[in-house]
Curated annotation (Swiss-Prot):
Key words of the record: Carbohydrate metabolism, Hydrolase
GO terms under biological process: carbohydrate metabolic process; glucosamine catabolic process; N-acetylglucosamine catabolic process; N-acetylneuraminate catabolic process
Active site annotation, chain numbering: 67, 136, 138, 143
Activity regulation, free text: Activity decreases at high substrate concentrations, which may reflect substrate inhibition. Unlike the E.coli enzyme, is not regulated by an allosteric mechanism.
The EC number(s) this enzyme carries: 3.5.99.6
HAMAP family per record: GlcN6P_deamin
Protein name, per record: Glucosamine-6-phosphate deaminase 1
Chemical reaction(s) catalysed: alpha-D-glucosamine 6-phosphate + H2O = beta-D-fructose 6-phosphate + NH4(+)
UniProt family annotation: Belongs to the glucosamine/galactosamine-6-phosphate isomerase family. NagB subfamily.
Source organism: Bacillus subtilis (strain 168)
The keyword Hydrolase appears for this protein: yes
């Protein structure tokens, strides 16, 4: 696990975008694993900038997203389908037919998880997977206690995760209680993982991660089992770093 400490969130975002861009330049038809939430937004802004100023092309890439809320249609402003289109896809030249996100509005969520896992597997190993981390160590929506052998599955979101995401919704009662997420084993199948951590609220999670103890009680600790993980942390997130 390689750890890079950045002075600011902006610097973190620039480095993450450059690493992702280099992956695309080396392999124009790369499979990118994408994340949502507040932390990756700066990376997406920087990738859009590279597209506009350096002619970085996304024309041949394929994207697979980590997760999606259950029960939200793709045009719901709080869905991750909407998030990805709004923050990234509509600003670049990628093909919509090559964007893959779990269908949280499927009639049979378990069947949708199996379909999505098979889809990700059929694309071959993801070339680079972007990740964020929750205060409780969750990656994707894999909450504490999730098996490291898990594949794409339906998860019941714990109260801490729902509270953290409530800022995007009218109220806590509007936050879905379930989601579909790639499993930890699915994530670990990626060739390279880029973990982005920003802000004082994540400092305790950084401390636990870098202590190196591997436990299903702290899902992100599974990343120690992967051979190519880069962790980008800003100064605030690094404030309790061991």
């Amino acid at each position: 696990m390689k750890v890079m400490e950045c002075q600011t969130y902006e610097e973190l975002s620039q480095i993450a975008a450059r690493i992702t861009a280099d992956t695309i330049k080396e392999k124009p038809d790369a499979v990118l694993g994408l994340a949502t939430g507040g932390t990756p937004e700066g990376t997406y802004r920087q990738l859009i900038r590279l597209h506009q100023t350096e002619n970085l092309s996304f024309q041949n890439i394929t994207t697979v997203n980590l997760d999606e809320y259950a029960g939200l249609s793709s045009d719901d402003p709080n869905s991750y389908h909407f998030y990805m289109n709004d923050r990234f896809f509509q600003h670049i030249d990628s093909k919509p037919s090559r964007h893959f996100i779990p269908n949280g509005n499927a009639d049979d969520l378990e069947a949708e998880c199996r379909r999505y896992e098979q889809l990700v597997d059929s694309l071959g190993d993801t070339d680079i997977q972007l990740l964020g981390i929750g205060r409780n160590g969750h990656i994707g929506f894999n909450e504490p206690g999730t098996s490291f052998k898990s594949r794409t599955h339906v998860v019941t979101l714990n109260e801490q995760t729902r509270q953290a995401n409530a800022r995007y919704f009218p109220s806590i009662d509007s936050v879905p209680k379930k989601a579909l997420t790639m499993g930890i084993q699915t994530i670990l199948s990626s060739k390279r993982i880029l973990l982005l951590i920003s802000g004082k609220s994540k400092a305790e999670a950084v401390r636990k991660l870098l202590e190196g103890n591997i436990s299903e009680d702290f899902p992100a600790s599974a990343l120690h089992l992967h051979s190519d993980v880069t962790v980008l942390i800003d100064r605030e997130a690094a404030s309790l770093r061991p």
